[in-house]
Amino acid sequence: MKKNIHPKWYKHSIVYGNGQQILTVGSTKPELHVEVWSSIHPFYTGSQKQLDTEGRIEKFMRKYGMK
């Protein structure tokens, strides 16, 4: 392997989310900051909200004056 061409590897990179330490991983950066992770994502917490949106077909029909 050639020397001095590979990035520095940190065995214990700390992942932060919302100001608190989430986990430790290996990375090319000493710290990682994330906005969304499984502890707060609506899919994993069960707090998903269903939006009351118009269906694609109805929107298409209305847009092109069909029906």
Curated annotation (Swiss-Prot):
Biological classification of the source: Eukaryota, Rhodophyta, Bangiophyceae, Cyanidiales, Cyanidiaceae
Single GO molecular function: structural constituent of ribosome
One GO CC term, this protein: ribosome
Organism the protein comes from: Cyanidioschyzon merolae (strain NIES-3377 / 10D) (Unicellular red alga)
Gene name for this UniProt entry: rpl31
InterPro entries: Ribosomal_bL28/bL31-like_sf, Ribosomal_bL31, Ribosomal_bL31_sf
Pfam families: Ribosomal_L31
Family (UniProt): Belongs to the bacterial ribosomal protein bL31 family. Type A subfamily.
Predominant location: plastid
GO biological process, one term: translation
Subcellular location: Plastid, Chloroplast
Complex formation: Part of the 50S ribosomal subunit.
Function comment: Binds the 23S rRNA.
PANTHER family registered for this protein in UniProt: 50S RIBOSOMAL PROTEIN L31, CHLOROPLASTIC (PTHR33280), LARGE RIBOSOMAL SUBUNIT PROTEIN BL31C (PTHR33280:SF1)
Protein name (database record): Large ribosomal subunit protein bL31c
